[in-house]
């Protein structure tokens, strides 16, 4: 069976010139950590999401680690709790879970979307399940 391949070139094509310009501005500005572009991104995220705070991180692993740590600090989760995650996930998802003392529960993806198969998720939920980490590796949200 052949599977369609994700073409990042096609996906990014409509935005390429804008991305090149933005990247050049950041490089020429010399601020890769914090700085006005990161502050602007955080402000725009707050406006878009309708929230008061947003924190840009260096990578997805850091973001996932902080999110799960916040849930633990708020008492929503505790070490030993389970987090359902797609079996075809990127390793950062699993590292964020295990680094926080949580237990990953792997669920197979749908053959049609490559995302979590919802019928299998229902069967994987236990009394220790506290979260489902939705990972859309192939730009498909459904």
Per-region residue spans from a language model:
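N-terminal "arm"/small-domain region of PLP-dependent enzymes with the aminotransferase-like
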Residues: 1-31, 36
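Conserved beta-strand segments of alpha/beta enzyme cores
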Residues: 2-4, 53, 103
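Short hydrophobic motif
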Residues: 7, 23, 45-46, 83
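PLP-dependent aminotransferase class I/II
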Residues: 9, 38-43, 48-54, 119, ...
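Short alpha-helical
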Residues: 14, 40, 62, 91-92, ...
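Phosphate-binding glycine-rich loop
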Residues: 31, 36-82, 96-98, 106
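PLP-dependent aminotransferase-like
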Residues: 72-142
């Amino acid at each position: 069976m052949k599977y369609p391949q994700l073409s990042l070139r096609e996906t990014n094509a409509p935005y390429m010139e804008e991305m090149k310009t933005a990247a050049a501005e950041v490089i020429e500005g010399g601020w890769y950590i914090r700085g006005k572009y990161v502050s602007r991104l955080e402000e725009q995220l707050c406006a878009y999401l309708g929230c008061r705070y947003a924190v840009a991180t260096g990578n997805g692993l850091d973001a996932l680690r902080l999110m799960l740590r916040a849930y633990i600090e708020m008492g929503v989760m505790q070490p030993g709790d389970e987090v359902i995650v797609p079996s075809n996930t990127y390793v950062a998802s699993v590292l964020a879970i295990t680094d926080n003392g949580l237990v990953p529960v792997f669920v197979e993806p749908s053959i049609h979307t490559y995302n979590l198969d919802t019928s299998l998720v229902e069967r994987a939920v236990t009394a220790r399940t506290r979260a489902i980490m939705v990972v859309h590796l192939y730009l498909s949200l459904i």
